[in-house]
């Protein structure tokens, strides 16, 4: 496990509307890359809104990577996957050792994370579908995410990056760029953050 990093700005984000507003804002403000890893991603109203945002990012030249659990996201339609790929979004499935429609055996991708430009990230327990969003007459399940800018986000970025094969071209983010960005965080805002990875 990695040690603690200190140059981080941290904020708790409540699930539902606040989470999805922040998620869309992050994608819309991306300049270089967007990495998303999610356990459940369904192309309902919420999922389709995120899909459109990812497609718009890819259209303006941002490198977009979507990594999903093959079993938990099996309701995502092939049509949506094809449209994402056609728009330039890289889509990858995390496959178990054995699966059928009602059973799986093996490791799962339980990550729920987004990283933008190697400097901003949001990690939590919120999946991409309507039941995690605040819809009219149907409030979201109570869940939280941590939003982070700084060194810890760069570690999460590398975790996401390393899960893609080398043949997939990814923009290289030099540490100096992140170091310069971290320097913009006032020291009074610094929080110590330790990144721990568990994909079971």
Where are these regions (language model features)?
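Charged, low-complexity intrinsically disordered terminal segments
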Residues: 1-200
């Amino acid at each position: 496990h990695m040690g603690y990093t200190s140059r981080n700005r941290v904020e708790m984000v409540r699930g539902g509307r606040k989470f999805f507003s922040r998620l869309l804002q992050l994608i819309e403000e991306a300049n270089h890359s967007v990495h998303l890893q999610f356990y459940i991603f369904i192309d309902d109203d919420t999922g389709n809104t995120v899909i459109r945002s990812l497609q718009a990012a890819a259209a303006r030249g941002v490198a977009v990577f979507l990594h999903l659990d093959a079993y938990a996201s099996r309701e995502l339609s092939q049509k949506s996957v094809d449209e994402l790929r056609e728009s330039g979004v890289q889509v990858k499935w995390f496959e178990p050792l054995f699966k059928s429609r009602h059973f799986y055996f093996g490791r799962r991708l339980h990550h729920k994370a987004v990283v933008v430009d190697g400097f901003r990230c949001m990690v939590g327990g919120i999946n991409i579908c309507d039941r995690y969003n605040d819809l009219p007459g149907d409030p979201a399940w109570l869940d939280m995410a941590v939003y982070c800018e700084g060194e810890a986000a760069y570690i999460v970025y590398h975790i996401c990056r390393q899960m893609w094969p080398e043949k997939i071209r990814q923009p290289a983010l030099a540490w100096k760029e992140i170091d310069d960005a971290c320097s913009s965080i006032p020291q009074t805002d610094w929080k110590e953050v330790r990144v721990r990875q568990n994909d079971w």
